[in-house]
Design a protein with these regions (language model features):
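Patatin-like phospholipase
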Residues: 1-38, 46-285, 289
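Short "domain-exit" segments at the C-terminal end of structured domains
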Residues: 290-294
Length: 294
């Protein structure tokens, strides 16, 4: 049983908004016993638990335009536009390593959402050791359909967890969280629209018909989840931090000026709600350390 958990939506490079929010949390000494992340949200979760302030910001700003990260050259060479092998290998271990010792000391439960291509359903994994180069579970959670081939874990192939459970608040409750703080990467009025190019999607994933169905129905599930999140806040069971305006940021945005603005928006939105958040956390018996920055 956890008094309060943290739920992190993904969104590709739009999740730099979450990076700003979590850096504000670190500055204010806010930690959680349980964190669940989806796609880029899982990467944010790892840096947050490891107290690597600024790590996700720097990765997004410094490497979003790097051809090793995403490019047509990768597609020609490896058959993947997004180079997960480089992202979760050289970048995550050599260029911008995680503080593994600090992560281990945190004693925080991390849940990562992935999508099973065969069943078309979300699965929930609990990685503990990030010493293994490649971070296969994180890589699977970030394996964007169409831009990657997915990741094989065991006998099955997995893709981005956002396909099937973009905002896993319900699973946080199932895992024993009494309350939750939810960080979204879309504004309150956002509604996801049906995806186009259905024929192309069916062709690409013809070996995985249930995955195809999940992709095409994602907008329905997402919009229901959004409604559930705001309802939970209305009941006092959740505290939601979301952009105060539409971010107009594609999943694979490379414009570093725009990304920096989104990061600053996340930090500002978190600080603007900090007093209310701390009051919510106090009721949830969450310990808050002394702020490291004012």
């Amino acid at each position: 049983m956890y008094s309060c958990g943290l739920v992190l939506e993904g969104g590709g490079n739009r999740a730099i908004y979450t990076s700003g929010v979590l850096d504000a949390f670190m500055d204010q000494g806010i930690t959680f016993p349980y964190v669940i992340g989806v796609s880029a949200g899982s990467c944010n979760a790892v840096s947050y638990i490891g107290k690597c302030r600024g790590r996700q910001h720097d990765i997004s700003i410094q490497y979003s335009g790097d051809k090793r990260f995403m490019s047509l050259e990768n597609m020609i060479k490896n058959g993947e536009f997004l180079n997960g092998e480089w992202l979760f290998g050289e970048l995550s271990y050599d260029l911008s390593p995680l503080d593994q010792e600090t992560y281990d000391r945190a004693n925080t439960t991390l849940c990562v959402v992935v999508t099973n291509a065969l069943t078309g359903k979300a699965e929930y994994m609990y990685p503990k050791d990030f010493h293994k180069r490649g971070c296969p579970i994180l890589r699977a959670s970030c394996a964007l359909p169409g831009a990657t081939k997915g990741v094989v874990l065991g006998k099955d192939r997995y893709f981005d967890g956002g396909v099937t459970d973009s905002i896993p608040l319900a699973h946080a409750y199932e895992d024993g969280c009494q309350k939750a703080v939810v960080v979204l990467t879309q504004d309150r009025n956002y509604q996801k629209q049906p995806m186009g190019h259905a024929r192309l999607i069916r062709r690409i994933f013809r070996k995985y018909p249930l995955m195809t169905r999940a992709i095409l129905n994602r907008y329905k599930i997402y919009n229901r989840q959004l409604e559930a999140v705001w309802d939970a806040q209305g009941r006092g069971d959740a505290f939601v931090i979301a952009p105060d305006h539409p971010l107009h940021c594609p999943t694979l945005e490379r414009n570093t000026d725009k990304l920096e603005q989104i990061y600053q928006t996340g930090y500002r939105n978190a600080m603007e709600q900090m007093d209310a958040l701390k009051a919510f956390l106090a009721l949830s018996l969450i310990h808050i350390s002394e702020p490291t920055r004012q």
